[in-house]
From Swiss-Prot:
Phosphoserine found at: S554
Keywords: Autocatalytic cleavage, Cell membrane, Cytoplasm, Glycoprotein, Lipoprotein, Membrane, Nucleus, Palmitate, Phosphoprotein, Repeat, Signal, Transmembrane, Transmembrane helix
Function: The alpha subunit has cell adhesive properties. May provide a protective layer on epithelial cells against bacterial and enzyme attack.
Protein name: Mucin-1
Membrane topology, from the record: Single-pass type I membrane protein
Residue numbers bearing the Phosphothreonine modification: T551
PROSITE patterns: SEA
InterPro entries per record: SEA_dom, SEA_dom_sf
Region (Disordered): 28-359, 544-563
Phosphotyrosine: residues carrying this PTM: Y530, Y539, Y545, Y556, Y570
Motif Required for interaction with AP1S2, residue range(s) on this chain: 570-572
PANTHER family with a match to the protein in the record: MUCIN-1, MUCIN-1-RELATED
The species this protein was found in: Bos taurus (Bovine)
Covalently lipidated residues, kind S-palmitoyl cysteine: C511, C513
Amino acid sequence: MTPDIQAPFLSLLLLFPVLTVANVPTLTTSDSINPRRTTPVSTTQSSPTSSPTKETSWSTTTTLLTASSPAPSPAASPGHDGASTPTSSPAPSPAASPGHDGASTPTSSPAPSPAASPGHDGASTPTSSPAPSPAASPGHDGASTPTSSPAPSPAASPGHNGTSSPTGSPAPSPAASPGHDGASTPTSSPAPSPAASPGHNGTSSPTGSPAPSPAASPGHDGASTPTSSPAPSPAASPGHNGTSSPTGSPAPSPTASPGHDSAPSLTSSPAPSPTASPGQHGASSPTSSDTSSMTTRSMSSSMVTSAHKGTSSRATMTPVSKGTPSSVPSSETAPTAASHITRTAASSPSIALSTSSNPKTSQQLSVRVSLYFLSFRITNLQFNSSLENPQTSYYQELQRSIWGLILQIYKQRDFLGLSEIKFRPGSVVVELTLAFREGTTAEWVKAQFSQLEAHAASYNLTISGVSVYSAPFPSSAQAGSGVPGWGIALLVLVCVLVALAIIYLIALVVCQCGRKKCEQLDVFPTLDAYHPMSEYSTYHTHGRYVPPGSTKRSPYEEVSAGNGGSNLSYTNLAATSANL
């Protein structure tokens, strides 16, 4: 951590036991050069300067006004009851420290905008009272007086009994927070806008430098929300007790962080002069400003984040304490206060920034259409080949004539248009399709055309043979019913394959039947090749097979005796005798 960041935490840790102590008039500010050194500043109460302005009341809380000094803004120590007086140097806007009972006004250092710490009883929220002028808070005897030291601006801690009063710059009326005795007078130093943290009891009004808009810290319940009504007074967001008044510097639009209860919006209050609210001990008189009207930035420069209720606004103001004769001029202020003003609230009504947009959604009208086919003959013209080509001049001229004739005849609201103009031989036969709203009949279409045939003379057309009949409305299924060429070829191929398969099956059946027929012929042969087994001898020896009924003897049955010269034969009796 850098010394600039360590200084506020160190001061808070050292002064934590004093948080419960009230009415401590000292305010510790951190030096930009030596951040570890703190200088106590005693509170000074001076008589408030009252101005003869119209008395109006703003129910606001402690305002934190930033000035333009180069030193960073110190944080007021907690547990102090005093107001920190801003010096003449352009100090940045102070950041309110939590748990403090006092208001601190920022000095003239141009440091970046301070952010009030969350969880404090102070917030930069505009209140909803319609009074344009800022009012000192009632019942409090504390004011912030500017000192001449160039120290950085202290940050008012939330829940403090003091107010930081802006002095007379074109910023309209800053309002002191309620419950505080201080006057807030706007001055003309351009300091960057501080970002008030939600839940703080103080308002931080940014000065008129083109510093970026403050953003409310997330997780806090505080924001300054301007009202969209033409009333000058800003409307305080719920749970906040402070206002931040926007002025006419072209600063970028503030954006509230998401998840916060704050919404940034700008309103312009037409009331010129700030006045002290009744029941308060001090009045805030604007000094050294030519205009007291609050200027609003353009609506396009501000962005509203949803779920936020706080406004961040900048004003060209330097804090001036009660009783100071005049505001201290800042070295970085613009030469004229009017140069920072872009739009005065006195001459223009309040501008409310609205984020909700209701774009008109175009409804698609469904119209039921009736189509009619119209045909008629043009007898004074002759058909030729040029009427077959839409690119020829004769075709286009005749087409324009028919269009003009149809538009003159059917001028009613129900007529939607025509299409598909065709010509064919027979003198010239014109065929076209007319579109009408549903409810039109073919008889009415023919009657209208027949009654107004006189219009055809203006186009040098002689019409006869008018016929009208209802045409079917083309559906998407009918439009896409055409079969492509590849589909037809595929279909033919499938048919051929099926035919071949059928032929093959027929041939296969015929072959099977032929085979079965051949087997039957073999079973019943023409030759008698069957012999009963009973006709064969069971066995025989030394002989060969002799078929039954054969008278020829086997040569093996005859046995020669060899040397005896006698024939010896052996006969198998079993084969020759049936008695065996």
